[in-house]
From Swiss-Prot:
Name of the protein in its database record: Chorismate synthase
Species of provenance: Sodalis glossinidius (strain morsitans)
PROSITE patterns, per the entry: CHORISMATE_SYNTHASE_1, CHORISMATE_SYNTHASE_2, CHORISMATE_SYNTHASE_3
GO annotation, biological process: amino acid biosynthetic process; aromatic amino acid family biosynthetic process; chorismate biosynthetic process
Lineage top rank: taxon: Bacteria
Signal sequence segment: none
Length: 361
């Protein structure tokens, strides 16, 4: 199976399945001498961890990460960092009744068509359970970026269904289970999740992720543009069906006189481009918006077929998120950090000696 790695200078490889014995990862390219311990990774893993609130899946995984290699006496050695997270709360029997069915909206059918077989237990490799290891690797990138140049990567729930959450207060994001910066939305979000659980249904979501204090100059023309790599990484997250950088599709209705980010001696006067021009960071905040589909694992009966070619109706039982967008926030942060770390190291390798006068204050 190809496609399990991302990055060039900072390279992350993951392995493992939803109901396998463990999830694993290998992180290459971390410079030596960086203080690193398991607790540095655990904070973000706990933010993504299932079973932590009544708004998400009730699968209870401690998600305690183990650093197997690449760290000695509390600092990175420059060699590959091996990571492992044990799976402890699998209930594979929940899926035995549907092992011959193709769940509508899931990867069951496409995996079977590609490989001729599939792991039906929770989706196997296609499950969002795999993203735990991305978050662990992303935590390494976030720490390095923060220490080296003060870069901060953070995200929030921007929309759930028809509920739009404004960016009113970043400090509120870590104070509620929705990662929502708008306290005025919390009651409506709670009511929506309650209604979805009662109906056995799910809902889509929008997530925004932002990188602040990023230096100008990151990104490689032409095919490795920073925004292209970010879109690639963010689209690889389970359930993501759309990615916008900056104003995204809203630019369709704008004129050039509105959309261009004018520059004065005091700096850029707007950020419609989302911090990236010509595929290279401008020094402004890098902003990405994600659209996540509603999970197809719901209690509402749906039509499908089985392996024998019979038309059937099925209900997907098990423990699932009524809105996957909630726990997608730390995952999106991790993927953005992984891409930024990769480009930071690439820039340092090629252009470390470049000194460009910046006329912008």
């Amino acid at each position: 199976m190809a496609g399990n790695s991302i990055g060039q200078f900072f390279r992350v490889t993951t392995f493992g399945e939803s109901h396998g014995s463990a999830l694993g990862g290998i992180v290459d390219g971390v410079p030596p001498g960086i203080p690193l311990c398991e607790e540095d990774l655990q904070h973000d893993l706990d933010r993504r961890r299932p079973g932590t609130s009544r708004y998400t899946t009730q699968r209870r995984e401690p998600d305690r990460v183990k650093i197997l290699s690449g760290v000695f006496e509390g600092v990175t050695t420059g060699t590959s960092i091996g990571l492992l997270i044990d799976n402890t709360d699998q209930r594979s029997q929940d899926y035995s009744a549907i092992k011959d069915f193709y769940r509508p909206g899931h990867a069951d059918y496409t995996y079977a068509q590609k490989y001729g077989r599939r792991d039906y237990r929770g989706g196997g490799r296609s499950s969002a359970r795999e993203t735990a290891m991305r978050v662990a690797a992303g935590a390494i990138a976030k720490k390095y970026l923060a220490q080296q140049c003060g870069v901060r990567v953070r995200g929030y729930l921007a929309q759930m269904g028809d509920i739009h959450c404004e960016l009113k207060d970043w400090t509120q994001v870590e104070k509620n289970s929705f990662f929502c910066p708008d306290v005025d939305c919390l009651e409506a979000l709670d009511a929506l999740i309650h209604d979805l659980k009662k109906a056995g249904d799910s809902i889509g979501a929008g997530v925004t992720v932002v990188a602040e204090n990023l230096p100008a100059g990151l990104g490689e023309p032409v095919f490795d543009r920073l925004d292209a790599d970010l879109a690639h990484a963010l689209m690889s997250i389970n359930a993501v069906k759309g990615v916008e950088i900056g104003d995204g599709f809203a630019v369709i209705g704008k004129r050039g006189s509105e959309n261009r980010d004018e520059i004065t001696l005091e700096g850029f006067q707007s950020n419609h481009a989302g911090g990236i021009l010509g595929g290279i960071s401008s020094g402004q905040p890098v902003i990405a918006h994600l659209a996540l589909k509603p999970t197809s694992s719901i209690m509402v009966p749906g039509r499908t077929v089985n392996r024998s070619g019979d038309a059937v109706e099925m209900v997907t039982r098990g423990r699932h998120d009524p809105c996957v967008g909630i726990r997608a926030v730390p995952i999106a942060e991790a993927m953005m950090a992984i891409v930024l770390m990769d480009h930071f190291l690439r820039q340092r390798a090629q252009c470390a000696d470049v000194v460009a006068a910046a006329p912008i204050r």
